[in-house]
C-alpha cells in the first residue's frame, strides 16, 4: 500500500480538500493501492472538521469528506509521498522531520500552472480557485505515483 499525505498549515482548508478530491479520483480510476491522508503543520485546529468553505466547495461538486478531522504532521509519520501546498509547508515539514524518507513535492509541481504555491483560502476566501488548482493537479499526481510505484489501474 502506498501512503500519500497532503500537508498545509492548519489541515482545515487545502489539505483536506486535496485528500477528498484525490480519494474520489482514485476511486473513479479504480486504483486501490494508494491510501490518502492529510495533515497540518500547526496545532490550532486539531480534531476540527474541514473549514466551512472547504465543506461547501466539496458539497458543490459532490465529493465526500465524511469523518475528516484535522491531524498534525508528526516526526514519526511514515508516508511514501508528501505533498505540500506551499513553500512554507515544505520548510515546516523539513523542520518537523529532518530525516524525511518519503518523496516531498509541492502540489503545483503536478500542474500546468505558473504558480508554485496553492494560496490559503482561509485568508483569501477563494475556495473555488483553490479547488480548481487542486483538482487540476490530482490526475497528474496520480499518474506520477502509478508510474513511480509501478501500480496498475483497472
Swiss-Prot record:
The active site is at residues 8, 14, 120. It holds the Pfam family LMWPc. Gene3D superfamilies: 3.40.50.2300. GO terms for molecular function: protein tyrosine phosphatase activity. Dephosphorylates the phosphotyrosine-containing proteins. Belongs to the low molecular weight phosphotyrosine protein phosphatase family. This is Low molecular weight protein-tyrosine-phosphatase PtpA. It comes from Staphylococcus epidermidis (strain ATCC 35984 / DSM 28319 / BCRC 17069 / CCUG 31568 / BM 3577 / RP62A).
Amino acid at each position: 500500500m502506498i501512503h500519500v499525505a497532503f500537508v498545509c498549515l492548519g489541515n482545515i482548508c487545502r489539505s483536506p480538500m486535496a485528500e477528498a478530491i484525490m480519494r474520489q479520483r482514485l476511486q473513479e480510476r479504480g486504483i486501490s493501492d494508494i491510501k490518502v491522508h492529510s495533515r497540518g503543520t500547526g496545532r490550532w485546529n486539531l480534531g476540527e472538521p474541514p473549514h466551512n468553505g472547504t465543506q461547501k466547495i466539496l458539497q458543490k461538486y459532490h465529493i465526500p469528506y465524511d469523518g475528516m478531522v484535522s491531524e498534525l504532521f508528526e516526526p514519526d509519520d511514515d508516508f511514501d509521498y508528501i505533498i505540500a501546498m506551499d513553500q512554507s509547508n515544505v520548510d515546516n515539514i523539513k523542520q518537523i522531520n529532518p530525516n524525511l524518507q518519503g518523496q516531498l513535492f509541492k502540489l503545483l509541481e503536478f500542474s500546468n500552472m505558473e504558480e508554485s504555491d496553492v494560496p490559503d483560502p482561509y485568508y483569501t476566501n477563494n475556495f473555488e480557485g483553490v479547488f480548481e488548482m487542486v483538482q487540476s493537479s490530482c490526475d497528474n499526481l496520480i499518474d506520477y505515483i502509478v508510474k513511480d510505484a509501478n501500480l496498475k489501474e483497472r
